[in-house]
Amino acid sequence: MDRISITLGERSYAIIIANGLLQDPTSFWPLARGDKVLVVTSNYIASLYLEILSQILTELGIIIDLCILPDGEQYKSLAMIDKIFTALLKKYHNNDTTIIAFGGGVIGDLAGFAAANYLRGVRIIQIPTTLLSQVDSSVGGKTAVNHPLGKNMIGTIYQPTSVIIDPNCLATLPRRELSSGLAEVIKYGILFDVNFFNWLELNIDALLGLEPHTVTWCIRRCCEIKAKIVTADEHEKGVRTLLNLGHTYGHAIETHMGYGNWLHGEAVAVGIMIVVQVSCSLGYFSNVDTERVKTLLLRAGLPVIGPMKISLEDYLPYIMRDKKTTNGILHIILPLKLGSAEVHTYRISEWQKLIAHLI
């Protein structure tokens, strides 16, 4: 069992990683006999794993209520938050309750947002079931819902009590979702760890084949990187900003194409290629490494070119609303070389010229 700590004073918590954790009663600290929980999950995950989770919680003497939501990014909305609140209120959950987020990134965001706001904050345990949520979104406390005009526009940072990662859950993950998660994995190598990027080049086929040791090691390495970043910069005022690599255009694609039509990792992969190519054209990122990034993304089953139906002008409203834009100045994350990146600032008009040939 791997245990990674995020040290944030009284909000510190552990990420626990091991195959079979879902059936290990010692995983569910700090729950105790007689505690009350609301399990928030999706139809798909409920059909596969809810019986297993319910059985272990029942054996621990935990009182379980359920809130089962539809699957898909299009449901990451305030309407679903209201459903969670209603489930909590109807069953008389008070401020010592615990919400369990049992699912992928959408469920983690919804449950986390609800936990942050219900009775001004209740405990939440994250049990991520997709690669993307295991390596990224379940760690660090970011929670948000979408708005028709932009992704993740309504949210907060609210740390979980613990994160329980069972890589066995990936056995039922659709291949497209697995590839989507690999975009965030590759992002870590580009940003912070050239040796990890090199390792990914050697092991991408084993990851796609869900080779157990390889997958578990990969998840652990990603969580180690994310934990270090979050511990240093919880509220994204410094180094944590770098984790937004590729997300400005990624979020624009997801929103413009309709939530759920492009998966998050697919859109981020395109966003990564845009900034890598810009960095190369500016003389930072080498041609050789640009091709390495492109090749690895393609091998992971990810797109490297955005949808043809989005024009340069179509992107503009999303860029103007992006959290990294202030007073017409876009703060963009540019990789300088494999394992290193920094934030550069451009007027939106200047940036549009830089990427015109890439859209």
Swiss-Prot record:
Keyword Lyase applies: yes
SUPFAM superfamilies noted in UniProt: Dehydroquinate synthase-like
Molecular functions (GO terms): 3-dehydroquinate synthase activity; metal ion binding; nucleotide binding
Source organism superkingdom: Bacteria
Chief localisation class: cytoplasm
Co-factor: note: Binds 1 divalent metal cation per subunit. Can use either Co(2+) or Zn(2+).
Annotated binding of NAD(+), by residue: 71-76, 105-109, 129-130, 142, 151, 169-172
One protein family per Pfam: DHQS_C
Entry keyword set: Amino-acid biosynthesis, Aromatic amino acid biosynthesis, Cobalt, Cytoplasm, Lyase, Metal-binding, NAD, Nucleotide-binding, Zinc
Keyword Glycoprotein attributed: no
Catalyses which reaction(s): 7-phospho-2-dehydro-3-deoxy-D-arabino-heptonate = 3-dehydroquinate + phosphate
Subcellular location: Cytoplasm
GO biological process: one example: amino acid biosynthetic process
Any one annotated GO CC term: cytoplasm
Family, per entry: Belongs to the sugar phosphate cyclases superfamily. Dehydroquinate synthase family.
Function: Catalyzes the conversion of 3-deoxy-D-arabino-heptulosonate 7-phosphate (DAHP) to dehydroquinate (DHQ).
Protein name: 3-dehydroquinate synthase
Organism taxonomic ancestry: Bacteria, Pseudomonadati, Pseudomonadota, Gammaproteobacteria, Candidatus Palibaumannia
